[in-house]
A protein has these predicted regions:
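Catalytic His-Asp segment of secreted/periplasmic serine-dependent ester chemistry enzymes
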Residues: 186-281
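N-terminal secretory targeting modules
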Residues: 1-83, 271-281
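Conserved SGNH/GDSL esterase-like catalytic core that processes O-acyl groups on lipids
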Residues: 73-156
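Active-site segments of SGNH/GDSL-like serine hydrolases
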Residues: 136, 140, 165-210
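Short, well-ordered beta-to-alpha junction loops that form the rim of enzyme active sites
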Residues: 90, 177-180, 234-236
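Extracytoplasmic/secreted proteins, especially bacterial periplasmic and envelope-associated proteins
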Residues: 83, 87, 120, 132, ...
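Loop/turn elements at helix/coil->beta-strand transitions in domains of secreted/extracellular proteins
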Residues: 82-84, 128-133, 168-173, 227-230
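Extracellular glycan-modifying ectodomains
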Residues: 23-33, 78, 95, 128, ...
Length: 281
């Protein structure tokens, strides 16, 4: 290792030590760092890089924890954290781009889409090479009943996740739970009357299938855990912000997306993502 390289590493080590709260006082300086590295290098040439890597990992973990705290506390807008992510999903997910929360370059959603649309997006997704992939499918899948059972649909969903993993082995994949359907016919206003709706085209069979959404979410949560995939449970925000559903009982208003986006980002942060960049960089 050249002396120039040792000086740079010593400066990095010193910075890491100070960031880590390990200040050595006035006696810690670059010259001492170089001497320390030279002595350490004679014992183990790889030890220097190992120390710096460990310090970097510790620093990233502190940054991740602080970012998580800020997002949860509402001090950090979650949407800038989507800059290295891509969202795929149905018309509900389209709202992230439509309402201006996520840039069009990060959006691969489409109205009426299901997991059957994922294969045709793989080449584009691979070319985009995102660090994070958020999947928000399920409403249309459950409604059409194509798979015959929830378990069969979940199995194919996870097959499509595996397809993405094969194209993007380093990407973090996050599955959003399916937002519930609120039957407009079951709602009443302050007078006890059913308010007028925007004219949903759902059949009674559609409504019965959509009533399975909570069960689908439960089954997918278990399956995702078994397959090492992050699953985001949106049930709490869906209950808290039920008033943000549109009259059709399917779509959500613009005001709901910050809560949904926050949920997605928090899930990735809690699993060690977002701030956890490569320590070897």
């Amino acid at each position: 290792m050249t002396r120039k390289r040792k000086t740079a590493l010593a400066a990095g080590l010193l910075a890491a030590m100070l960031l880590g709260g390990c200040s050595g006082g006035d006696g810690v300086d670059i010259a001492q760092g170089v001497a320390y590295l030279e002595a350490l290098e004679q014992q183990d040439p790889d030890a220097v890089d190992q120390i710096l890597r460990q310090r970097r990992l510790e620093q990233l973990e502190r940054e991740r924890e602080e970012l998580l705290r800020q997002v949860k506390a509402g001090e950090q807008d979650p949407f800038p954290l989507f800059q290295d992510a891509v969202i795929l999903g149905d018309s509900r997910a389209v709202g992230f781009f439509y309402y201006g929360f996520v840039d069009e370059s990060r959006d691969l959603t489409g109205s009426g889409e299901t997991i059957l649309d994922i294969p045709k997006k793989l080449d584009t997704l691979q070319a985009m090479n995102p660090r994070y992939v958020y999947l928000a499918y399920g409403l249309n899948d459950i409604k059409i009943g194509h798979w015959g059972s929830l378990q069969a649909h979940i199995s194919e969903y996870l097959d499509r996740v595996q397809d993405i993993r094969e194209r993007l082995p380093e990407a973090v994949i996050v599955i959003s739970s399916v937002l519930p359907y609120h039957d407009p016919n079951a709602r009443t206003d302050a007078t006890g009357e059913t308010p007028p709706t925007s004219g949903s085209s759902l059949t009674e069979a559609d409504r019965k299938r959509l009533a399975q959404i909570p069960e689908w979410n439960r089954l997918m949560a278990d399956a995702a855990r078994e397959h090492g995939v992050i699953f985001v449970d949106n049930s709490a925000i869906c209950q808290e912000y039920e008033n943000l559903w549109e009259k059709d009982g399917i779509h959500v208003s613009k005001s709901f997306y910050p809560h949904w986006g926050k949920n997605l980002i928090v899930a990735a942060l809690e699993e060690g993502g977002i701030a956890d960049e490569s320590a070897s960089a």
